[in-house]
Amino acid sequence: MFLRNAWYAAGWSRDYERTLTAETFLGEEIVIFRREDGSPVALQDACPHRKLPLSFGQLKGDTVECGYHGLTFDGGGRCVAAPTQPGSIPRRARVKSYPAIDRYGLLWIWMGDPEAADPDLVFPIENFDDPSWGRTDGGVLEIDCNYLWICDNLLDPSHVAWVHVGSFAGSGTDDVPLEVTRTERGVIVWRWIRGRPPSPYYAELVKFDGPCDRLQHYEMCVPGIALNKSVYTPAGTGGPGAAPVPETYVNISYNFMTPISAERTRYIWFQHRNTDPQDATISQQMNEGARQAFEEDRAVLERVQRGMARDGSEAIDLGLDAGAKLFRRHLERLIDEESAGAGA
Protein backbone atom coordinates (compact mmCIF):
# COMPACT_ATOMS: atom_id res chain seq x y z
CA MET A 1 0.00 0.00 0.00
CA PHE A 2 1.92 2.99 -1.31
CA LEU A 3 1.07 6.54 -2.31
CA ARG A 4 2.63 7.05 -5.73
CA ASN A 5 1.86 10.67 -6.54
CA ALA A 6 4.45 12.00 -4.12
CA TRP A 7 8.12 12.90 -3.97
CA TYR A 8 10.27 10.30 -2.19
CA ALA A 9 13.87 10.79 -1.11
CA ALA A 10 15.88 8.24 -3.08
CA GLY A 11 19.18 9.02 -1.39
CA TRP A 12 21.85 11.67 -1.02
CA SER A 13 22.52 13.56 -4.26
CA ARG A 14 26.24 13.03 -3.75
CA ASP A 15 25.77 9.26 -4.07
CA TYR A 16 24.43 9.41 -7.65
CA GLU A 17 27.05 10.11 -10.28
CA ARG A 18 27.80 9.38 -13.94
CA THR A 19 27.22 5.70 -13.33
CA LEU A 20 24.22 3.37 -13.60
CA THR A 21 22.83 2.81 -10.11
CA ALA A 22 20.21 0.10 -9.63
CA GLU A 23 17.52 0.85 -7.05
CA THR A 24 14.16 -0.53 -6.00
CA PHE A 25 11.45 1.80 -4.70
CA LEU A 26 7.82 0.90 -4.01
CA GLY A 27 8.53 -2.52 -5.49
CA GLU A 28 9.65 -1.07 -8.84
CA GLU A 29 13.17 -1.62 -10.17
CA ILE A 30 14.75 1.63 -11.32
CA VAL A 31 18.10 2.72 -12.75
CA ILE A 32 19.38 6.19 -11.84
CA PHE A 33 22.17 8.14 -13.53
CA ARG A 34 23.17 11.71 -14.34
CA ARG A 35 23.30 13.39 -17.70
CA GLU A 36 26.48 15.14 -18.75
CA ASP A 37 25.04 18.41 -17.41
CA GLY A 38 24.55 16.78 -13.98
CA SER A 39 20.76 16.53 -14.07
CA PRO A 40 19.35 13.24 -12.75
CA VAL A 41 17.52 10.58 -14.76
CA ALA A 42 15.45 7.69 -13.41
CA LEU A 43 14.24 4.92 -15.73
CA GLN A 44 12.57 1.54 -15.44
CA ASP A 45 15.44 -0.89 -15.00
CA ALA A 46 14.39 -3.39 -17.66
CA CYS A 47 15.01 -3.39 -21.39
CA PRO A 48 11.67 -4.12 -23.11
CA HIS A 49 13.25 -6.78 -25.34
CA ARG A 50 14.15 -9.50 -22.81
CA LYS A 51 14.00 -7.51 -19.56
CA LEU A 52 17.73 -7.44 -18.91
CA PRO A 53 18.29 -4.67 -16.35
CA LEU A 54 19.52 -1.53 -18.06
CA SER A 55 21.82 -1.07 -15.07
CA PHE A 56 23.76 -4.03 -16.52
CA GLY A 57 24.43 -1.98 -19.65
CA GLN A 58 26.53 1.10 -20.37
CA LEU A 59 26.05 4.82 -19.98
CA LYS A 60 26.89 6.54 -23.27
CA GLY A 61 26.55 10.30 -23.21
CA ASP A 62 23.02 10.96 -21.99
CA THR A 63 21.72 7.54 -23.05
CA VAL A 64 21.75 3.99 -21.69
CA GLU A 65 22.75 1.11 -23.95
CA CYS A 66 21.35 -2.31 -23.06
CA GLY A 67 24.07 -4.89 -22.48
CA TYR A 68 22.24 -7.60 -24.44
CA HIS A 69 21.55 -6.28 -27.96
CA GLY A 70 22.39 -2.60 -27.74
CA LEU A 71 18.93 -1.06 -27.62
CA THR A 72 19.60 2.49 -26.46
CA PHE A 73 17.29 4.73 -24.43
CA ASP A 74 17.35 8.45 -23.75
CA GLY A 75 16.51 10.16 -20.47
CA GLY A 76 12.82 10.19 -21.30
CA GLY A 77 12.73 6.42 -21.81
CA ARG A 78 12.48 6.56 -25.61
CA CYS A 79 14.48 4.07 -27.68
CA VAL A 80 16.83 6.03 -29.93
CA ALA A 81 18.90 3.19 -31.42
CA ALA A 82 18.42 -0.48 -32.33
CA PRO A 83 21.78 -1.58 -33.75
CA THR A 84 20.57 -5.01 -34.95
CA GLN A 85 17.97 -3.38 -37.24
CA PRO A 86 19.23 0.07 -38.29
CA GLY A 87 16.53 2.51 -39.24
CA SER A 88 13.78 0.33 -37.79
CA ILE A 89 13.34 1.05 -34.09
CA PRO A 90 10.38 -0.91 -32.69
CA ARG A 91 7.46 1.41 -31.92
CA ARG A 92 6.91 -0.13 -28.48
CA ALA A 93 10.58 0.02 -27.51
CA ARG A 94 10.44 2.42 -24.60
CA VAL A 95 10.78 2.28 -20.82
CA LYS A 96 9.01 4.16 -18.07
CA SER A 97 10.73 7.32 -16.90
CA TYR A 98 10.34 8.88 -13.46
CA PRO A 99 10.70 12.60 -12.66
CA ALA A 100 13.78 13.19 -10.50
CA ILE A 101 15.25 16.36 -9.03
CA ASP A 102 17.94 17.45 -6.57
CA ARG A 103 16.97 19.53 -3.56
CA TYR A 104 18.33 19.97 -0.02
CA GLY A 105 21.24 17.67 -0.83
CA LEU A 106 18.85 14.80 -1.62
CA LEU A 107 17.76 13.18 -4.86
CA TRP A 108 13.96 13.05 -5.04
CA ILE A 109 11.94 10.73 -7.26
CA TRP A 110 8.26 10.91 -8.20
CA MET A 111 6.74 7.44 -8.48
CA GLY A 112 3.32 8.30 -9.92
CA ASP A 113 1.84 10.31 -12.79
CA PRO A 114 4.68 12.37 -14.31
CA GLU A 115 2.25 15.15 -15.23
CA ALA A 116 1.53 15.68 -11.52
CA ALA A 117 5.19 15.97 -10.50
CA ASP A 118 5.32 19.56 -9.29
CA PRO A 119 8.76 20.41 -7.81
CA ASP A 120 7.04 22.77 -5.38
CA LEU A 121 5.55 19.70 -3.68
CA VAL A 122 8.96 18.55 -2.42
CA PHE A 123 8.90 18.57 1.37
CA PRO A 124 10.18 22.00 2.52
CA ILE A 125 13.15 22.17 4.88
CA GLU A 126 13.20 25.49 6.67
CA ASN A 127 16.50 27.27 7.37
CA PHE A 128 18.39 24.76 5.19
CA ASP A 129 20.68 27.46 3.80
CA ASP A 130 20.70 29.62 6.94
CA PRO A 131 24.38 30.00 7.96
CA SER A 132 23.39 30.44 11.60
CA TRP A 133 22.06 26.88 11.79
CA GLY A 134 24.27 23.82 12.19
CA ARG A 135 23.69 20.57 10.35
CA THR A 136 24.86 16.99 10.79
CA ASP A 137 25.91 14.84 7.85
CA GLY A 138 23.12 12.37 8.61
CA GLY A 139 23.03 8.89 7.18
CA VAL A 140 21.16 6.10 5.44
CA LEU A 141 19.82 2.88 6.92
CA GLU A 142 17.95 0.04 5.28
CA ILE A 143 15.51 -1.58 7.67
CA ASP A 144 13.78 -4.92 7.14
CA CYS A 145 10.44 -3.51 8.12
CA ASN A 146 7.34 -2.06 6.46
CA TYR A 147 7.59 1.70 6.33
CA LEU A 148 4.35 2.17 8.27
CA TRP A 149 5.80 0.55 11.39
CA ILE A 150 8.60 3.10 11.18
CA CYS A 151 6.06 5.89 10.75
CA ASP A 152 4.25 4.61 13.84
CA ASN A 153 7.51 4.69 15.77
CA LEU A 154 8.23 8.27 14.70
CA LEU A 155 4.81 9.35 15.96
CA ASP A 156 5.49 7.82 19.37
CA PRO A 157 7.45 10.05 21.77
CA SER A 158 6.95 7.54 24.60
CA HIS A 159 9.12 4.77 23.16
CA VAL A 160 12.26 6.75 23.95
CA ALA A 161 11.80 5.95 27.65
CA TRP A 162 12.54 2.26 26.95
CA VAL A 163 14.37 2.09 23.61
CA HIS A 164 16.70 5.11 23.95
CA VAL A 165 17.54 5.08 27.64
CA GLY A 166 21.02 6.51 27.11
CA SER A 167 20.09 9.22 24.61
CA PHE A 168 16.58 10.61 24.11
CA ALA A 169 14.91 9.31 27.27
CA GLY A 170 14.47 11.43 30.36
CA SER A 171 12.09 12.28 33.15
CA GLY A 172 8.52 12.55 31.89
CA THR A 173 8.97 10.71 28.60
CA ASP A 174 7.15 7.69 30.01
CA ASP A 175 3.98 9.25 31.40
CA VAL A 176 3.38 12.94 30.58
CA PRO A 177 0.15 13.02 28.49
CA LEU A 178 0.43 13.40 24.72
CA GLU A 179 -1.46 15.82 22.48
CA VAL A 180 -2.46 15.00 18.89
CA THR A 181 -2.96 17.62 16.17
CA ARG A 182 -4.12 16.97 12.61
CA THR A 183 -2.47 19.03 9.83
CA GLU A 184 -2.98 19.33 6.08
CA ARG A 185 0.08 17.20 5.45
CA GLY A 186 -0.26 14.70 8.29
CA VAL A 187 -0.27 14.47 12.09
CA ILE A 188 1.68 15.95 15.01
CA VAL A 189 2.04 14.20 18.38
CA TRP A 190 3.52 16.55 20.96
CA ARG A 191 3.89 17.46 24.60
CA TRP A 192 5.71 19.86 26.87
CA ILE A 193 7.60 18.23 29.75
CA ARG A 194 8.17 20.92 32.34
CA GLY A 195 10.82 21.49 34.97
CA ARG A 196 12.85 18.32 34.36
CA PRO A 197 16.53 17.65 33.57
CA PRO A 198 17.39 17.48 29.86
CA SER A 199 17.77 14.06 28.25
CA PRO A 200 21.28 12.52 28.12
CA TYR A 201 21.68 13.28 24.41
CA TYR A 202 21.02 17.00 24.90
CA ALA A 203 22.51 17.56 28.36
CA GLU A 204 25.84 18.80 26.96
CA LEU A 205 24.29 20.68 24.05
CA VAL A 206 21.81 23.06 25.68
CA LYS A 207 23.09 26.55 26.48
CA PHE A 208 21.92 26.84 30.09
CA ASP A 209 22.21 25.02 33.41
CA GLY A 210 19.48 23.55 35.57
CA PRO A 211 16.07 22.07 34.77
CA CYS A 212 14.31 22.73 31.50
CA ASP A 213 10.98 22.83 29.78
CA ARG A 214 11.18 20.32 26.93
CA LEU A 215 9.03 20.04 23.83
CA GLN A 216 8.72 16.72 22.03
CA HIS A 217 7.21 17.51 18.62
CA TYR A 218 6.78 14.38 16.48
CA GLU A 219 5.30 15.25 13.09
CA MET A 220 4.58 12.78 10.28
CA CYS A 221 3.80 13.96 6.76
CA VAL A 222 2.73 12.06 3.66
CA PRO A 223 4.08 9.97 2.07
CA GLY A 224 6.36 9.10 5.02
CA ILE A 225 8.47 12.05 6.14
CA ALA A 226 9.02 12.76 9.83
CA LEU A 227 10.02 16.07 11.35
CA ASN A 228 10.96 15.48 14.98
CA LYS A 229 11.62 18.74 16.79
CA SER A 230 13.24 18.94 20.23
CA VAL A 231 13.05 22.28 22.05
CA TYR A 232 14.83 22.93 25.35
CA THR A 233 14.34 26.17 27.25
CA PRO A 234 14.99 27.15 30.89
CA ALA A 235 12.31 25.89 33.26
CA GLY A 236 9.36 28.24 33.42
CA THR A 237 9.92 29.78 29.97
CA GLY A 238 8.48 27.10 27.69
CA GLY A 239 5.00 26.05 26.71
CA PRO A 240 2.48 26.37 23.87
CA GLY A 241 2.70 29.84 22.35
CA ALA A 242 5.64 30.91 24.52
CA ALA A 243 8.13 33.13 22.72
CA PRO A 244 11.68 31.75 22.49
CA VAL A 245 14.20 33.15 24.96
CA PRO A 246 17.88 33.67 24.06
CA GLU A 247 18.83 30.32 25.62
CA THR A 248 16.23 28.32 23.68
CA TYR A 249 17.81 25.31 21.99
CA VAL A 250 16.14 23.76 18.93
CA ASN A 251 17.14 20.61 17.10
CA ILE A 252 15.11 19.22 14.21
CA SER A 253 15.59 15.66 13.00
CA TYR A 254 14.42 15.11 9.42
CA ASN A 255 13.61 11.48 8.61
CA PHE A 256 12.64 10.22 5.16
CA MET A 257 11.08 6.77 4.82
CA THR A 258 11.16 5.44 1.26
CA PRO A 259 9.67 1.96 0.82
CA ILE A 260 11.83 -0.48 -1.09
CA SER A 261 9.21 -3.20 -0.79
CA ALA A 262 6.40 -4.08 1.59
CA GLU A 263 8.98 -5.46 4.01
CA ARG A 264 12.04 -3.23 3.55
CA THR A 265 12.52 0.52 3.87
CA ARG A 266 15.27 3.01 3.12
CA TYR A 267 15.59 5.44 6.02
CA ILE A 268 17.44 8.70 5.33
CA TRP A 269 18.02 11.28 8.03
CA PHE A 270 19.90 14.38 9.11
CA GLN A 271 19.65 16.93 11.92
CA HIS A 272 19.45 20.72 11.91
CA ARG A 273 20.09 22.86 15.01
CA ASN A 274 19.84 26.57 15.81
CA THR A 275 23.33 26.79 17.35
CA ASP A 276 27.03 26.07 16.69
CA PRO A 277 26.86 26.17 12.88
CA GLN A 278 30.59 25.66 12.35
CA ASP A 279 31.33 23.27 15.21
CA ALA A 280 32.40 20.02 13.54
CA THR A 281 32.96 18.31 16.89
CA ILE A 282 29.37 18.89 17.99
CA SER A 283 28.09 17.79 14.58
CA GLN A 284 30.05 14.55 14.83
CA GLN A 285 28.93 13.96 18.41
CA MET A 286 25.29 14.46 17.47
CA ASN A 287 25.63 12.31 14.36
CA GLU A 288 27.13 9.41 16.28
CA GLY A 289 24.52 9.64 19.02
CA ALA A 290 21.65 9.75 16.56
CA ARG A 291 23.08 6.86 14.55
CA GLN A 292 23.26 4.74 17.70
CA ALA A 293 19.64 5.60 18.55
CA PHE A 294 18.44 4.71 15.05
CA GLU A 295 20.23 1.37 15.28
CA GLU A 296 18.30 0.80 18.51
CA ASP A 297 15.11 1.56 16.59
CA ARG A 298 16.10 -0.84 13.83
CA ALA A 299 16.66 -3.67 16.30
CA VAL A 300 13.14 -3.17 17.68
CA LEU A 301 11.34 -2.53 14.40
CA GLU A 302 12.74 -5.51 12.52
CA ARG A 303 11.48 -7.72 15.34
CA VAL A 304 8.10 -5.97 15.26
CA GLN A 305 7.90 -6.69 11.53
CA ARG A 306 8.64 -10.38 12.04
CA GLY A 307 6.33 -10.65 15.03
CA MET A 308 3.36 -8.96 13.37
CA ALA A 309 3.82 -11.04 10.20
CA ARG A 310 4.23 -14.35 11.99
CA ASP A 311 1.96 -14.26 15.03
CA GLY A 312 -1.71 -14.82 14.27
CA SER A 313 -2.90 -13.62 17.66
CA GLU A 314 -4.70 -10.30 18.08
CA ALA A 315 -2.59 -7.14 18.44
CA ILE A 316 -3.84 -4.33 20.65
CA ASP A 317 -3.40 -0.56 20.54
CA LEU A 318 -2.52 1.75 23.41
CA GLY A 319 -3.55 5.34 23.94
CA LEU A 320 -0.15 6.45 22.67
CA ASP A 321 -1.04 4.99 19.25
CA ALA A 322 -3.73 7.62 18.57
CA GLY A 323 -1.51 9.75 16.35
CA ALA A 324 -0.20 6.79 14.36
CA LYS A 325 -3.72 5.49 13.75
CA LEU A 326 -4.85 8.94 12.58
CA PHE A 327 -1.91 9.20 10.16
CA ARG A 328 -2.58 5.73 8.75
CA ARG A 329 -6.23 6.58 8.11
CA HIS A 330 -5.19 9.84 6.40
CA LEU A 331 -2.67 8.04 4.19
CA GLU A 332 -5.09 5.22 3.36
CA ARG A 333 -7.69 7.77 2.27
CA LEU A 334 -5.18 9.45 -0.08
CA ILE A 335 -4.15 6.09 -1.53
CA ASP A 336 -7.79 5.11 -2.08
CA GLU A 337 -8.48 8.44 -3.80
CA GLU A 338 -5.41 8.01 -5.98
CA SER A 339 -6.45 4.47 -6.95
CA ALA A 340 -10.00 5.57 -7.73
CA GLY A 341 -8.69 8.38 -9.93
CA ALA A 342 -6.36 6.03 -11.79
CA GLY A 343 -9.22 3.66 -12.52
CA ALA A 344 -11.63 6.34 -13.69
Kindly give the residue locations of the regions a language model identified.
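Hydrophobic, proline/glycine-rich low-complexity stretches
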Residues: 1-6, 22, 335
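A generic short-segment signal for beta-strand/edge and adjacent turn/coil regions
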Residues: 1-2, 10-14, 34-36, 65-71, ...
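A short, aromatic/hydrophobic, helix- or strand-capping loop or linear motif
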Residues: 2, 12, 58, 161-170
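Sequence-level motif detector for i,i+2 pairs with an aromatic at +2
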Residues: 5-7, 18, 95, 104, ...
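Rieske [2Fe-2S] iron-sulfur-binding domain
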Residues: 9-135
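C-terminal catalytic domain of Rieske-type non-heme iron oxygenases
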Residues: 39, 115-344
